[in-house]
Each structure stands twice: as C-alpha cells, then as structure tokens.
Amino acid sequence: MRCPYCGSLDTQVKDSRPTEDNTAIRRRRVCPDCGGRFTTFERVQLRELMVVKRSGRRVPFDRDKLARSVEIALRKRPVETERVERMLSGLVRQLESLGDTEITSETIGEMVMEGLKQIDDVAYVRFASVYRNFREARDFESLLDELQLGERKAEALAKLKRADRTASESEPE
C-alpha cells in the first residue's frame, strides 16, 4: 500500500481488525520511511458497478464519494458513525444485488434519501435539496409536507396494528 504522505510503496500493517458491523477490515499502517500512520479499509466487492449520470456519461461507482456526500448532509448532526457506515454498507450491498452493473445516479440518489430518512430528517432534507436541485422555498415546503405525510401514515399504521392485536387478544376462544 502506498504511503499517502511520502509515496513510499513499503508500508507495514500494525493492527488489523473487523469493523463493528463486520462488513470491512480496518488496518492501521505505518510507513518505515517517513513514520506516517494511516488507516485503510478492505471491503468485499461483488461486482464492478458503473454509474450512469444524468448526462449519459458512465463513471465507476465510488463508495468514498457516496460516503462524502452523506457526511456533508449529516454535518453537525448527532448521528453515530457506525450507524452511517451500516447504512452505506447496506446500500452498496443493495446496489450490488440489483443484478445490473450499470445503475443510474437517480436510483442511487433515491436509495440514499430513503436511508437518510431512516437516520435523520434534517440530513434527509439537506441531501434532497441538493439532489433534487431545490430553487425556491416552495420546494422545501413540498418535501416537508411529504415527510410529515409519511410520518402520519406510519403512525396510523402502528395504531391499526395495535388495535388489531388488542382485538385478537380479547376474542373468545
């Protein structure tokens, strides 16, 4: 592994362990030439994915780029790193299991929005505002209305399930 500080090709692994969610191996490395220390992650890649951009251009899928955009949406939000890592790993596994090597950027964007909606509403709105290219306050209003409608539907569904459970428990045998 090349040292990111001096470019030396001779680096040594000092510590190696699985990540908390067991989707990668975290390695601490040291460069004997400059003494620099850095961390690398090793992950399984089931297939080489290509992203089809809106312009029609095709670029290799970059998990790190995806992670950076999610981190920007989550900036200064109280969300655990492990939770974000689990979301990203799950998303990549979903993409790889779609069975297609070419995936549109729209598909990826929608999947990220769904993941962020489960983690943090503010991050969801931030990501959506950039992804959907919001221009006016009305764009935010309609997204927030959509978010609130989804929450009301979830609450109503939970109430129905509770009522159904209560009714089935009180039925005579």
UniProtKB/Swiss-Prot annotation:
Note accompanying the cofactor annotation: Binds 1 zinc ion.
Entry cofactors: Zn(2+)
Annotated zinc fingers (unnamed), start-end: 3-34
Taxonomic superkingdom: Bacteria
Chain ranges passing through the membrane: none
InterPro entries, alphabetized: ATP-cone_dom (IPR005144), NrdR-like_N (IPR055173), RNR_NrdR-like (IPR003796)
Key words, A-Z: ATP-binding, DNA-binding, Metal-binding, Nucleotide-binding, Repressor, Transcription, Transcription regulation, Zinc, Zinc-finger
PANTHER family in UniProt: TRANSCRIPTIONAL REPRESSOR NRDR
Protein family: Belongs to the NrdR family.
Name listed for the protein in its UniProt record: Transcriptional repressor NrdR
Record lineage: Bacteria, Pseudomonadati, Pseudomonadota, Alphaproteobacteria, Hyphomicrobiales
Gene from which the chain derives: nrdR
